[in-house]
Amino acid sequence: KKVGPIRSARQYYLEWLSSFDPLFIYDGCADTDNPKTDACGNIYSYKIKKIATAGAWRWNDGVRYAPHNEYSSLFTAWEYADDKGWDSMPNIESWKFKKDATVDNRGQKTKVKIFFHERLKNNGAYDSTWTYDIKTNSYYEEIGGKKLIDQETNTQVYTKNLIIQEVEYSPAYDDKGRIILTTIGEGKATYFIDGKITTGKWKKTSRTDRTTYYDNSGNEIQ
């Protein structure tokens, strides 16, 4: 099965994915002297199960513009993993999931608009809007004012649960303008579920720990 597009690795990606112990397919990485941004070095020091740029496992789809046109195959990835002896399933603690609220118990908060940092002079081309549909109890995404269509299914991208996770941001002050995102610790979170808005906090105690989400009363979000 086709998977992608494949992009380069960043330190905060490694911190988010570590709790899942996955096969990590990527092309390129940040190579720095700063351990807070050195994705290339940390991929090795963390012993990430990596599938990098070498080999015939990737191709360009011929439709999308670079660098969004690079894809791979799940079957090829699993074959590579078998050859490396990565054939065991990780032990993953699941988040909690509830049933959909009944129509009568769904809210009316129908729009979520997320604006990118003001330094991006692109007239909102990457701003994200999620529109809630009470019938399907789902949030449908637009990017830059246009519906975001999944290239493989030709349907609009949607989700049942939307989380805005706020993290500390700081520049790395290097020649590439890299940034540092604090993903370990805790911070504010806002949840959009069942057409309603709930606030609380996220918590991640270590790189390999799963991020957990709570409401303001300390209950885990479902």
Q: Could you describe each region identified by the protein language model?
A:
Residues 2-222:
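A surface/extracellular/periplasmic glyco- and lipid-processing/surface-interacting theme
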